[in-house]
């Protein structure tokens, strides 16, 4: 079997080498970056709860993301039939759910998860899609630190499908 040749991409964190099989195609791009279609997930550290959804073509475009179920065990999203078809979903185990994370400069205690725009990744088909949640039972943002306004579930809660981002 031939070994896959790594590609080198530029990021704000410096040069990164990734396998082409780790490239995720977003047919609609990401909100605000609709012209960017190819991304990959980069680990910041092995023990960190966050990943970077990094554009392959734009070194400046890297979004901090996290598995929402690590913080909020009962998080639920609605995915339309059309969105499932676009993602080529046959089974819920094919998908990882991610949300963007915001950390205000100098205020890590105000780290928040954006629950209104989850990002779904079919890790088998290497397809991604941001799925806005218009009518959800959750606020747009949830703080990850319990001392803030919204209390969240314990950090050791896990997504029930075991198909999370750790597969990357």
From Swiss-Prot:
Its main location: cytoplasm. It comes from the Bacteria. Pfam families: FliW. InterPro entries: Flagellar_assembly_factor_FliW, Flagellar_assmbl_FliW_dom_sf. GO terms for biological process: bacterial-type flagellum assembly; regulation of translation. Keywords: Bacterial flagellum biogenesis, Chaperone, Cytoplasm, Translation regulation. It is found in: Cytoplasm. One of its GO terms (cellular component) is cytoplasm. Interacts with translational regulator CsrA and flagellin(s). HAMAP family: FliW. Acts as an anti-CsrA protein, binds CsrA and prevents it from repressing translation of its target genes, one of which is flagellin. Binds to flagellin and participates in the assembly of the flagellum. Belongs to the FliW family. This is Flagellar assembly factor FliW. It comes from Oleidesulfovibrio alaskensis (strain ATCC BAA-1058 / DSM 17464 / G20).
